[in-house]
Regions:
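PRY/SPRY (B30.2) beta-sandwich protein-interaction domains
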Residues: 1-133
Length: 133
């Protein structure tokens, strides 16, 4: 099985997202962006590092039907790890989950679609396993 380069998708990004020429790095003021390749089964890993910015980032996964503008965490088809509180938000609910994160932190996502498990990591430390329907 070969590797696959997945980048940020310029066709689905919100207006407040600027991608660099590689589509591997973005600057965001509002809205969101998805990757170029969605997944429906298997086990997947990705990570991102916060280089700069304010305290409003939400990193996570979303169904392909979810728009990348507006309030994402209100959708039941989105799971995001919120920078300020460390909460795991979906469907307007944000229970306590992990620790907050900021500049120079690396957030990893482990997604097991076969077993409906989602896990976020901060700088190599698991923040806990969640069920992701």
């Amino acid at each position: 099985m070969g590797s696959q380069l997945v980048t940020w998708d310029s066709s689905t990004k919100g207006a407040g997202v600027t991608l660099d020429s590689s589509k591997l790095t973005f600057t965001i003021t509002t809205d969101s962006v998805k990757s170029t390749i969605g997944k429906t089964y298997g086990k997947w890993y990705c990570e991102c590092t916060i280089n700069s910015g304010s305290n409003g980032a939400m990193i996570g996964i979303a169904d392909s039907t979810v728009s990348m503008t507006g309030t994402l965490f209100a959708s039941p088809k989105v799971y995001v790890y919120y920078q300020v509180s460390g909460g795991l938000y979906s469907n307007n609910q944000g229970p306590a989950y992990g620790s907050s994160y900021g500049v120079n932190d690396t957030i990893s996502i482990l997604l097991d679609l076969d077993n409906k498990k989602l896990e976020f990591w901060k700088n190599g430390v698991s923040q806990g396993v969640s069920n992701a329907n």
